[in-house]
Amino acid sequence: MNNGILHQNYNSKKFDIIKISLASPEVIRSWSHGEVKKPETINYRTFKPERDGLFCAKIFGPIKDYECLCGKYKRLKHRGVVCERCGVEVEQAKVRRERMGHIDLVCPVVHIWYLKSLPSRIGLFLDMPLKNVEKVLYFESYIVTDPGMTPLEKKQLLTDEEYAEALENYGYEFEASMGAEAIRDLLADTDIESEIELLQAECEESKSTAKKEKAIKRLRLLETFQASGNKPEWMVMTVLPVLPPDLRPLVPIEGGRFATSDLNDLYRRVINRNNRLKKLLDLNAPDIIVRNEKRMLQEAVDALLDNGRRGRAVTGSNKRPLKSLADMIKGKQGRFRQNLLGKRVDYSGRSVITVGPSLRLHECGLPKKMALELFKPFVYSKLRLGGHATTIKQAKRMVELEEAVVWDILETVINEHPVLLNRAPTLHRLGIQAFEPRLIEGKAIQLHPLVCAAFNADFDGDQMAVHVPLTVESQLEARVLMMSTNNILSPASGQPIITPTQDIVLGLYYITREKEGARGEGKLFSSYEDVSRAYNSGTIDIHAKIKLRIDRQVFDTKGNTYNEKGVVNTTVGRALLLNILPEGLSFSLLNKVLVKKEISKIINQAFRVLGGKATVVLADKLMYAGFKYSTLSGVSVGVDDMTIPDNKEAKIEEAEKEIKQITEQYQSSLITENERYNNIINIWSKTSDEVGASMMDAISKDTVSINGEKKEIESFNSVYMMAKSGARGSYNQMRQLAGMRGLMAKPDGTMIETAITANFREGLSVLQYFTSTHGARKGLADTALKTANAGYLTRRLVDVAQDLVVIEEDCGTDDGLMFSAIVEDGEVKVPLVERALGRTLAADVVTEKGVVLLEAGTLLDENLVELLDDNGIDMIKVRSPITCKTRRGLCAKCYGRDLARERQVNVGESVGVIAAQSIGEPGTQLTMRTFHTGGAASLGITVSDIKVKTAGKIKFKNIRTVTNKEGQEIVISRAGEIIVSDTMGRVREQHKIPMGAVVPLASGKAVEIGDVIATWDPHAQPLITDVAGKVVLEDVIDGITSKHTYDDLTGQQTIEITSISQRTTSKNLKPVVKIVDEKGAKLKSIPLAVGAVLNVADDSILEVGDIVAKIPLEGSKNKDITGGLPRVAELFEARRPKDAAILSPCDGMVRLGNRDTKEKQRIEIIDKNGHIVEEILLPKSRHLVVFDGEQVSRGDVLADGPTDPHDLLKYKGLEEFADYILIEAQSVYRMQGVVINDKHIETIVRQMLRKAVILDEGDSKFVKDESIELVRILEENDKLRKQGKKEVEYELVLMGITRSSLSTESFLSAASFQETTRVLTEASINSQIDNLRGLKENVLIGRLIPTGTGLAVRKESAKIEKMREELGVEDNMVFTDLSSFNPEEISFDSIQSQKEDKDINEDIEESLRNALESLDF
């Protein structure tokens, strides 16, 4: 393969594109510096390379710098001389890393990638099956290359016997041969143009889709060859390039042996076989021997290029497969991922971390020894500049001896020189942050406790790495962008990430608690100082309730100021905290018991009102106070803190009695095995909860006597305080310590029915211990698997989104998504206020009275979203990354607010990577388990009615009802909802109403809290008729499609429909209830699903609203719900679920029962005129949810099942699809309590919609039904529009993140992701060009990435390049546009003086200035 870079000047970094294509033999020879003729490597006695061998110095260059092999010419002065004795050019030794050689192959050899990488390019080009091509290649069959006048066909295969027979019959009128020569001749003889014409004709005429698809594939391949300038015969090699020797080294190890790269073995085999073949041909050896040797040469080259791709892999002496050229570049250890995307860095160290409770937020403690090693160069230069040392050598000695002056200089060097701390795994950008180092004794790095959450660090032996930014530019970026004080908010959710945890929370909770009857209760103080004095002198207790006079200024988020004055009721502890509360925040924030949530609120409020700097100071002070008081409190865990409730034994006895009853009922066959199991699980979980509740009662209350009176007060029990404050532990853990452990899960998620009645304080018996090992080990195994899976998900997400950067301010679209509150189980889970915050409006917000409240294009901040809430707005249209019209990037308006910075996102922000990190990072917190509905997990009470939780009005949505003979309104629609709005008209509840529910109130009626608005049978779904008439049962035959059961106890008869799989005969019968009028004309037919129990008999008369049959809901409830990480991966991979719901492809009327086949049922959709518009064939086992004659709209569900996102996009449109992915993904995260902003998920969805399928090619070169990048279609349409031609029509197609990553425009990005061989094979045939637009491609070639400061540099250099062209300036003239400079803003002189070479690149200077302007620094 020929990389376009190679012909450029080696030092040049100034290339804009990289092109990859097939290399012709001439190109390979032009790279080469000589032919490798011998398989020898180096002489075992002299250790010098053999001439013409694999390490030959004449071909590849000298071994030592500027010295020829025989030693005649040495030193720099002979540079460029070719020694006449040994033929070596006097040059630097590093040319041995660059100079290639070549091997002239005696016979052509096929490149295995183009043969075996599927689809086989050679097979496709020649229109031959891969098997046949291989038969010819490996000398099993002849192939006819020119049939002449004989009846043989071109490309026909002949065995040896057939070939001999043909020779006898036709003599030499035809040509047939075998091996790579034959393939090469066929490739070279193909007339590409005429083949293309033939294929185009075939595409248009062909009726069969399979043929058409194959023709399109082949047409595409031929077209690429035609367009790319590659010749097909170049897929067969006649010259083999040889890698430079320093890239496949041979190093002597002790004992006179050599360690060598596997490539040398592989090259040796090729050279040996090539030379042997040359000899055999010179000797005119028999054909069979030559053939065998040619085959062996082909196999040797195959092994060198891609070992193991065909047949068994060639192994070395230790039975290990040899590493071929392909293995060198692919996989985690390959060139791409090991050396280009992940490099090791200098000036770094790592050590264990310990806690640094006295540090400030922007500091870290760095061990002196480590700092000295890291900052050595700076120390050396300072020692010289300060006159302490005259040479570097002397400075080095001083540092080694650790003289006193060295430590002083180290102090000055590290002053204000930030270092980067990183903790692996770096799952999001907060995994690397900058700190100012503080020198400490010891060997461990000290870390500030508040940043632990961001690093996910704890101090149980975690290690962290330190990196030193060297250049001034990098120090500046570290300080402005990466300093821990500039990363207060999480980029995933916009919530503070430096909130106190554990001990700090416990300390703050402890001192803000109040205690009845404490010393000094009821006293009045005039100021904080008075309280402090009284507390320190011991006259008042820290928990005493007191009165305090305050006088403070308070700011709100809108910037208004008001005074907070007067006497407040508080406690001593809260008054002591008043000192750390900054001016501008209300005392009411502190004047309560501070649990974790409340502390988080204080920090949040401080950030909103006072800004970053004040927040950092406050966070530090809160931390110091928390640590101080948690130490003073003396809270710790003792055995007596766990109080076992008195009624525990009684409760357990009661449970055991109930279980005994249930077991007896089961034994006398009154209940099923399933019911027995579920009941037992229910009893134990109820008992366990009750014991837990009484334990909490006991632990959470203390009885004290105040002035002789007994009073119950909240307990000061240590365990209770830890859990209550949110510092450590949970109710569930406390229940296991002092209540009962309860039910344990098996690894598959089901519950073990023998509960553990003991708790940890009493201790477990051997059996109980054994029972609990089950679940515990599952947990550990899960965690290990989960980490790897979450990491892989993150990697796929980053790969798909890496090139998505904000590249412009506004794309000008008015498209967007409709946002409303997210409602689950009737409750508002996420209010609109939260979803809308930080988004840009796509349309005006209008109140009910028609007043424009907010105009389109407004960025919604905290104050504006409150305005929405106050005016009862429950739906708005916001701009979204999914609908952004910017090409190859995003615009700032569609993205909205940068969550970590609280203002509109900057141009140049790499939002794609941030989105991927935000979704991937919590992945490790998600569960791996799939949840089972059933077992104790969700056996709550079965819901059979809906009670209103808020007073207001109800409104029906998509609900159709009929009135039955009792006068009740019965719902007959499927996807109906009842919406409850409050007096302001805001949606407060939303409830899904099942078919068959009774609704007592009409739409628009007022309701009070607790009113019932719907009731239904929770155990069965009824089929209800909306017409009156006589029943005719069709295909309901006892013993075949249905079974009669007679209940002895109740005397009831039931008819139940049986499943098709249970029938031996008559599989095409379809049980149906027909309703006919007096004349026998059909009014309605209702298909009966498997398991349906009939409520009517043949010939019975039905009224409107009567129940025809009931489908028991037992069976449908026990399907597994995929949860956790696998569900997120499933969504982003856009997998089609098994037995997905079938959606209607168009509007029309459903017609069933026509022309059903043996296995399948046919659904026809007909238009008004009775013409069939669409037909769908389904297995008979699928249950339809539509009736014959029902009207459906495009996208309505015809057969139920899980949603297929592809169909949703196709039939319901982009908005419904986006909504579905957002809600589904968010619900998984919400279950784990993880907050992720919607826009991150939208950003990934945008990348999943990068391709579109052509519906009508218009006047373009595209082919119908082909899928192409959306950007290319839009660009083509622009051209066509300008020329006044017909544009391309297309529709979006959905691709999973893996497929989307592999089909990006950049082949470098795709190759470094997965399936490297396939990607490179395809790219080289297409002569693909990589425009180096994404982040990954630029990292690979070692440049600034085009985001942030890199984007500014890129824009600047593009501007300069343009000016150069206009002015005709040559490359060596320095030229910068300084017109936009404003030297007053920043004085760069101070920076210049620190840099020895004064010439700072001006465009970097400009970009840094832009960066500084965009951050309020």
UniProtKB/Swiss-Prot annotation:
Binds 1 Mg(2+) ion per subunit. Binds 2 Zn(2+) ions per subunit. Zn(2+) 2 binds at residues 811, 884, 891, 894. Zn(2+) 1 binds at residues 68, 70, 83, 86. Mg(2+) binds at residues 458, 460, 462. One of its GO terms (biological process) is DNA-templated transcription. One of its GO terms (molecular function) is magnesium ion binding. It is an enzyme of class 2 (transferase). InterPro entries: DNA-dir_RpoC_beta_prime, DNA-dir_RpoC_beta_prime_bact, RNA_pol_asu, RNA_pol_N, RNA_pol_Rpb1_1, RNA_pol_Rpb1_3, RNA_pol_Rpb1_3_sf, RNA_pol_Rpb1_4. The keyword Flavoprotein does not apply. Keywords: DNA-directed RNA polymerase, Magnesium, Metal-binding, Nucleotidyltransferase, Transcription, Transferase, Zinc. Its cofactor is Mg(2+); Zn(2+). Its EC number is 2.7.7.6. It catalyses: RNA(n) + a ribonucleoside 5'-triphosphate = RNA(n+1) + diphosphate. It comes from the Bacteria. GO terms for cellular component: DNA-directed RNA polymerase complex. The RNAP catalytic core consists of 2 alpha, 1 beta, 1 beta' and 1 omega subunit. When a sigma factor is associated with the core the holoenzyme is formed, which can initiate transcription. PANTHER family: DNA-DIRECTED RNA POLYMERASE, DNA-DIRECTED RNA POLYMERASE SUBUNIT BETA. HAMAP family: RNApol_bact_RpoC. Belongs to the RNA polymerase beta' chain family. DNA-dependent RNA polymerase catalyzes the transcription of DNA into RNA using the four ribonucleoside triphosphates as substrates. This is DNA-directed RNA polymerase subunit beta'. It comes from Francisella tularensis subsp. mediasiatica (strain FSC147). The gene is rpoC.
